[in-house]
């Protein structure tokens, strides 16, 4: 089972917000997911990102692959640096 960390679209038409979820890569974008690890609201000024860093690091170390957009969000939150530090040391 290939697991990805990706965005699940929520909200109304023209006013989206997203949940950052861990899901099987074969499931639909807004379908079944394994765990919710945060959210992203691009409509708010400034955009709001809240991610549980411990869960995100654990999933990435266990082999979950973040999508490009989620990878950028994780980098801005400092999660990717934490993963690199945990995996390879300082």
UniProtKB/Swiss-Prot annotation:
One Gene Ontology term of the molecular function aspect: structural constituent of ribosome
NCBIfam families xref list: S16
PANTHER family given in the database record: 30S RIBOSOMAL PROTEIN S16, SMALL RIBOSOMAL SUBUNIT PROTEIN BS16M
Family (UniProt): Belongs to the bacterial ribosomal protein bS16 family.
Domain of life: Bacteria
Pfam families: Ribosomal_S16 (PF00886)
UniProt keyword terms in alphabetical order: Ribonucleoprotein, Ribosomal protein
GO CC annotations on file: cytoplasm; small ribosomal subunit
GO biological process: translation
Statement: the UniProt record of this protein carries the keyword Ribosomal protein: yes
Gene3D superfamilies attached to this UniProt entry: 3.30.1320.10
Protein name: Small ribosomal subunit protein bS16
């Amino acid at each position: 089972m290939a697991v990805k960390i990706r965005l699940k679209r929520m909200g109304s038409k023209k006013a989206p917000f997203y949940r950052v979820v861990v899901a099987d890569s074969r499931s639909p974008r807004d379908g079944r997911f394994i765990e919710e690890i945060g959210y992203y609201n691009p409509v708010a000024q400034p955009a709001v990102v809240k991610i549980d860093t411990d869960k995100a690091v654990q999933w990435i170390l266990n082999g979950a692959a973040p999508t490009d957009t989620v990878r950028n969000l994780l980098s801005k939150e400092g999660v990717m640096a934490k993963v690199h530090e945990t995996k390879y040391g300082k």
